[in-house]
Amino acid sequence: MVKNKKILVGILMGSASDAETMVETEKILKENKIPYEINVLSAHRNPDAVRKYTKIAEKRGIKILICGAGMAAALAGVVSSHTSLPVIGVPIETKSLQGLDSLLSTVQMPGGVPVACMAIGKAGAKNAAIFAVRILKAFK
């Protein structure tokens, strides 16, 4: 994490085990000197904490939220439903369905709940950070 700077990107993970994938997001943000923070918040186990974090993110100066989650992968959609910030979803690869469950849960959002969905796994985590960097650079 880049220290002593205003956080621009919030990385959320549904489970601590998702860190193995989301480290790819961190690498790209670090390389580009983008200040970020990481939180483990499950849409299923901690819905109130997810809502609280999401609702104050914009007031704190965060510009983009990146959400990595596996299986039912509701995190990105739930986050998007509580903010007007751009939300990027990263489907985490799973053992049972190789991440197809996560992909479909992340990409199939109802109208009015936009989530930019990346590829499954580490490639998606990397692309999420690259996409965030491009968004931030476009508005400098």
Predicted regions and their residues:
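Basic/polar N-terminal segments that are highly enriched at the extreme N-terminus
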Residues: 1-6
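Glycine-rich phosphate/diphosphate-binding loop of Rossmann-like nucleotide-binding domains
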Residues: 7-45
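C-terminal binding/interaction regions
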Residues: 13-20, 24, 37, 95-140
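N-terminal beta-loop-helix "entrance" segment that forms/cooperates
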Residues: 38-60
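Glycine- and other small-residue-rich loops at beta-strand/loop junctions that grip anionic moieties
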Residues: 39-43, 68-69, 92, 117-121
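Glycine-rich phosphate-binding loop
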Residues: 53-92
